[in-house]
């Protein structure tokens, strides 16, 4: 048997992506000023970042990062279990636990790593099972596959589907995992109903609230708190420090026993250098500002409502979302890419989301809003969206003879 050549495989896959127009290109940001970005010498208003509360360039957070870097250096120098766990890490974990109402928190470099850690450490047997929403983030899906346990997926937001999957797999330990806010659709999981299913089926309920933290709930405490669920009902959740909080990193929240088990057994935690202390200091300050500045969430919600109202008035096919993630359904990839390019010509950066990130035929423009956007920017964007849609429809219309 001839062993496959990896270089040939790579070239073949690249040709396939080219034929399908599914190559990916990184855009270099030369400068940033709030929601304005400079790319190739041109300034664009971006509607595609996750800086929901507008904290990424907040002067207090920058000052906290600079002070910590001057004091502790630019890196942790080791994993948490060796000599990388600094006082600022401890303070950040305490603040997170107090804010979200959990006994303990555990810091990670990013949400993807944290999701890998959870399932690798908890679902250790082949007959264990993780039941997930079909539209969960890729890191949750990949985590189950890498853990080596069984993966079962239920239709999006389908509580009965989740219950059915758990009932059909009574053997082995079980986890029911869901996003809080879904990153590509912007809708919110039915957490209260899912938590009841998890308790009934003796499954551990795990919520990845990467896009909910800071945005919803009391003091921005996220989707779990917004649903008035207790630690007993959602024993484990993940939050990121890189979206509404504007920085970098992630944390797991759970009981003291659960968090200690993860710290002692989760390989992605044990064998990874700790989050830089300066980033931890920035996140700590960001949390305090997010908790304090209720006006940011109020402003953000006003902009969401304005965008949706204007979009409906212009007949735009927006999806059902009340969060800062506002997808515009375009259907085919060609139309989506053309609309994204047309918006850029008008001074807006809105990314086209295509398969495999979303299902075939579900390509979309993923508009994300920030508390820093102005009402004028919202209104002008909607007008540009309507113009680009109409222009493409005119081009596609058959010529009358």
UniProtKB/Swiss-Prot annotation:
E.C. no: 2.3.1.47
UniProt keyword tRNA processing present: no
Pathway stated in the Swiss-Prot or TrEMBL entry: Cofactor biosynthesis; biotin biosynthesis
Modified residues (N6-(pyridoxal phosphate)lysine): 243
Annotated pyridoxal 5'-phosphate binding sites: 111-112, 183, 211, 240
Catalytic activity: 6-carboxyhexanoyl-[ACP] + L-alanine + H(+) = (8S)-8-amino-7-oxononanoate + holo-[ACP] + CO2
Protease as UniProt keyword: no
Residues that coordinate or bind substrate: 24, 137, 357
Gene3D superfamilies the UniProt entry points to: Aspartate Aminotransferase, domain 1, Type I PLP-dependent aspartate aminotransferase-like (Major domain)
Biological processes annotated in GO: biotin biosynthetic process
Name of a matching Pfam family: Aminotran_1_2
InterPro entries, A to Z: Aminotrans_II_pyridoxalP_BS (IPR001917), Aminotransferase_I/II_large (IPR004839), AON_synthase_class-II (IPR050087), AONS_Archaea/Proteobacteria (IPR004723), AONS_Proteobacteria (IPR022834), PyrdxlP-dep_Trfase (IPR015424), PyrdxlP-dep_Trfase_major (IPR015421), PyrdxlP-dep_Trfase_small (IPR015422)
NCBIfam families, per the entry: bioF
Family from the record: Belongs to the class-II pyridoxal-phosphate-dependent aminotransferase family. BioF subfamily.
Stored HAMAP family: BioF_aminotrans_2
Subunit architecture: Homodimer.
Protein task: Catalyzes the decarboxylative condensation of pimeloyl-[acyl-carrier protein] and L-alanine to produce 8-amino-7-oxononanoate (AON), [acyl-carrier protein], and carbon dioxide.
This protein's name: 8-amino-7-oxononanoate synthase
Organism the protein comes from: Xylella fastidiosa (strain 9a5c)
Phylogenetic placement of the source organism: Bacteria, Pseudomonadati, Pseudomonadota, Gammaproteobacteria, Lysobacterales
Gene it is expressed from: bioF
